[in-house]
Regions:
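Proteins enriched for Cys/Gly/acidic motifs involved in redox and nucleic-acid/cofactor modification
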Residues: 1-195
Length: 195
């Protein structure tokens, strides 16, 4: 796949969606719980997703029971992370039964695999949204459409890899930062879904 830069207009559109989500719940504090498995790129992506969530009015929490939004960001290269993700998704079902307004999403390279997307779509009906790494920058739009339509938004990787700069980031550490030095690769390793 090719990498393309996200335009300033596309970034501005995501900021518009951030404001629209913020306006949906102006009087209530909302919390986001992020669960990350796998590589350092996933850590960097999770920081970006949490930054966007904060811009939409969410506060990062370490307690999934407190969350209004749960995001799981697993790695597809490591099978253990995939299996752990599906197991944890099953545990989150019980939280959603207690809190039907809870929104649960899975993102990352695991979702980029068609068989995993189909598996989640069919076996995990309480998962509200899925999107692959190419659509990380569209998280505000995907969340807004999930919240306002009441329908599941299930995307794999749409189009080309997107390089999006200028979106908010939440750093989990005060003394280190995950920095992406490349997006994708062209080695076409048989075990990897990235290219």
């Amino acid at each position: 796949k090719n990498s393309t830069a996200v335009t300033e207009i596309q970034i501005a559109e995501q900021y518009r969606y951030m404001e629209l989500v913020r306006r949906l719940f102006p009087e209530r504090e909302r919390f986001v719980f992020m669960q990350t498995f796998g590589c350092q790129q996933n850590e960097a992506d999770s920081e970006r997703l949490c930054g966007m969530a904060e811009s939409m009015g969410y506060t990062v929490t370490g307690d999934p029971e407190q969350a209004d939004l749960i995001i799981v960001n697993p790695c597809a290269v490591r099978e253990h992370a995939e299996l752990k993700t599906l197991s944890i998704a099953g545990q989150y079902k019980h939280i959603k039964e207690k809190n039907p307004d809870l929104i649960i999403g899975i993102c990352g390279c695991m979702v980029s695999q068609d068989h995993r997307t189909l598996d989640i779509k069919n076996k995990y009906p309480y998962i509200d949204f899925l999107f692959g790494t190419f659509d990380n920058y569209r998280f505000p739009e995907i969340l807004y459409k999930t919240l306002t339509s009441g329908k599941r938004i299930l995307l794999g990787n749409e189009g080309d890899a997107a390089i999006a700069e200028g979106l908010p980031v939440h750093r989990f550490s005060s003394f280190k930062a995950w920095v992406s030095i490349m997006y994708g690769c062209n080695n076409f390793c048989t075990y990897c879904v990235v290219p």
